[in-house]
Amino acid sequence: MYVAAVIIAAGFVLFYCSYQIRLGAYVRTLCRNRAAGRVVALTFDDGPDPEMTPRVLDLLRERGVRATFFLVGAKAERHPELVRRIAAEGHDTGIHTWEHAAGFPMRSSWAMTADILRCRESLRQIAGVETHLFRPPFGVTNPMVARAVKRTQSRCIGWSVRSFDTLLRRSREAVAERIARRLGDGKVILLHEVGGQAVLGK
């Protein structure tokens, strides 16, 4: 009975660690850069999107702000002009896998490696950018993700402020308030191009 309880508890801990990217349990992950001083990093996941990405870029340009876009490879190939605009306007790009598949964390490390490299090469071909920034789908990490990150010489990027901007019925004001309450030196803010309409007041 005791052994079974220990096994169950250990399994729960491992599962919990997989979904808590800030713990860095499986792979060293940048979630905050205190050395950056009184600045924060804006990051946008799941793009590019033909409707939302131009609006996000317009807003950033108006405010003179730079951000990092973690792009999905298949979407990048469908909307190469948006990838080129992101790069041309001085924003950083990162890899958010080829399709953002729900089953990505369950793949073999070699399949993950191929996925990351495919996305990296696509971004290079489209916009001439060579990125080693990587954010795993849903922020899930495990030993397979760790091996793929190492093989591809990627730098895993997490977040220290989760906006929850994709939740239904979440207003722009609620999202902004949540972010404002959690601001701090060098924090990394997670936002979304797809499903994150609250940020732009849609």
Put a short name on every predicted segment.
Residues G47-E51, L71-H79, A102-W110, R135-P143, ...:
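Acidic-and-aromatic substrate-binding clefts and catalytic sites of carbohydrate-active enzymes
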Residues A4-C17:
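Hydrophobic core of alpha-helical transmembrane segments in multi-pass integral membrane proteins
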Residues R84, S109-I116, S171-A176:
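Charged helix-capping and loop-helix junction motifs
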Residues I179-K202:
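Catalytic grooves of carbohydrate-active enzymes
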Residues S18-F104, R118, S122, R151:
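Active-site beta->alpha N-cap acidic-glycine motif
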Residues V140, A146-R182:
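His/Asp/Glu-enriched short active-site or ligand-binding loop at hydrolase and phosphoryl-transfer sites
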Residues W98, A102-A148:
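Hydrophobic, well-structured mid-protein blocks that either form specific transmembrane helices
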